[in-house]
Amino acid sequence: MIGIIGAMDMEVNGLKERMQNAEVETIGTIDFYKGTIQGVPCVVARSGVGKVNAAICAQIMALMYRPKAII
């Protein structure tokens, strides 16, 4: 699984549109979209702007979904 984090909607909307079999899970205030993009298992999230928001989102993603990489 690959984790992808964007700060704003415009950074993740295209990925969410291309995602197949998407399931949404909300943890705290962050929506995580889990599915596949071109057959690759992915989880996509919008963290919000800022280093702290990105770090919180990355930590939750790492603990809950165990991706091989986070972009």
Q: What is the predicted function of each stretch?
A:
Residues 1-71:
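Accessory terminal and edge-of-domain segments that mediate assembly/interaction
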